[in-house]
Amino acid sequence: MSFLNRLFGKSDASQHNQGGTTMLNIGIVLGSTREGRVSPQVGEWVKELADKRGDANYEVIDIADYNLPLLGEAGQDASGAATWSEKIAQMDGFIFIVQEYNHSISASLKNALDYLRVEWNDKAAGIVSYGSVGGARATEHLRGVLSELSIAHVRVHPALSLFTDFENGTHFAPKDVQAQSVNDMIDQLLPWTEAMRSVRTKAGEVANN
């Protein structure tokens, strides 16, 4: 068992179904909508690794599938907002697939985050990033945004390099070590997600009293 597993506790299907509790729903959010993006390749790879664990329900959520114009811009069709709200509300936690744009996250991801508030609150998230320096600077920016939205973000952070984990910058071919990094991140994410679900449940009980 790795140091991280000893420290945070390795999550498995039996641990997350004790007492008949419902399995956690984890949304893998693709953070880019641009033409020619590689985030779908990264997202499907993360989902494939996660599904092998059998410890939660994992679903890829593509921002591009929702009609989300710039928030507050007059005369725009924001018909996708209600569907976006419903989908995010269904999730217990998230894995954000993040690419770096000028030291930050994409405008589409920031916009999608800004559309909602309570749907994000008291949930947990992990981050998988990529870029010339592994998307590290975008990740640090995203952490500040997630904190403001009351999303607890785990420390372990798989960082993919455009130089070593991609071929010609377009074909995703991760090094073997990256799979372990993703699993270590999920090992942290699931206990945090379970804990935050308890927070939401307790808050609901208080509100109903």
Regions found by a protein language model. Give the residues of each.
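N-terminal beta1-alpha1-beta2 submodule of the flavodoxin-like/Rossmannoid cofactor-binding fold
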Residues: S2-Y115, F172-N209
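Mobile beta-alpha loop/short-helix "lid" or hinge segments that flank ligand
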Residues: E59-P69, L149-G169
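Short, well-ordered alpha-helical segments in soluble proteins
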Residues: L116, W120, L146-S150, T193, ...
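Short, glycine-/small-residue-rich phosphate/pyrophosphate-handling segment
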Residues: N121-F163, V177-S181
